Design a protein with these regions (language model features):
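Catalytic glycan-binding domains that act on GlcNAc-containing polysaccharides
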Residues: 1-147
Length: 147
C-alpha cells in the first residue's frame, strides 16, 4: 500500500514550487515519516546545541523552545529550522498540516541544494544534519518508487 494520493499530489506540488525533483521529495517523505503527517520526534542533541541557548537567554518561551527541538510532519522539519526559514504559524504543530509542512520543508531543502551546488547527496546529508552517513543513499534508493 502506497501513500495516499492527496499527499503525493501535495508533495509533488510543493517540490515543483521550489524547483525540486518531486520523486526525491517523495523519497524524503517516505524516509522521514513513512507518509505520516502527524509524525513528530524530539531531538535532544539538536535542542541542546541550537535551541537551549535561545531559551536560556529569554529569546523564546519554554513551550516554544521545546517545540523547536522536535521534528514535525511529513518531512520531519525541525521546529527551529522552520522558524529560521520564516514559518510564522502560532504553533509549530501546524507543520503537521501536510500543505504547510511540505511547503516549508521544500523551501528548506531548496536552500540546502542551493548552498551545495545542487549536489543531491550533499544536500540530503545537510538536510539530515550529517548524523547518518547512509541517509542520502537510503533516500536516493527510494526515488525510483516515485518516478
Amino acid at each position: 500500500m502506497g501513500p495516499p494520493s492527496q499527499l503525493l499530489t501535495l508533495a509533488r506540488k510543493a517540490a515543483t514550487a521550489q524547483s525540486l525533483d518531486p520523486a526525491l521529495v517523495c523519497s524524503v517523505v517516505e524516509q522521514e515519516s513513512a507518509w505520516n503527517p502527524w509524525a513528530m520526534r524530539y531531538e535532544p542533541a539538536f535542542f541542546t546545541k541550537y535551541v537551549a541557548p535561545l531559551y536560556t537567554n529569554n529569546k523564546v518561551s519554554a513551550t516554544e523552545a521545546y517545540a523547536r527541538g522536535f521534528s514535525w510532519g511529513l518531512m520531519q522539519v525541525m521546529g527551529q529550522v522552520a522558524r529560521e526559514a520564516g514559518f510564522e504559524a502560532l504553533f509549530l504543530s501546524a507543520l503537521c498540516d501536510p500543505e504547510q509542512g511540505l511547503t516549508i520543508g521544500c523551501k528548506v531543502l531548496r536552500k540546502k541544494f542551493d548552498a551545495l551546488a545542487g549536489d543531491p547527496t550533499r544536500a540530503l546529508l545537510a538536510w539530515n544534519g550529517g548524523a547518518n552517513p547512509t541517509y542520502a543513499a537510503q533516500v536516493l534508493a527510494r526515488r525510483s518508487h516515485y518516478l
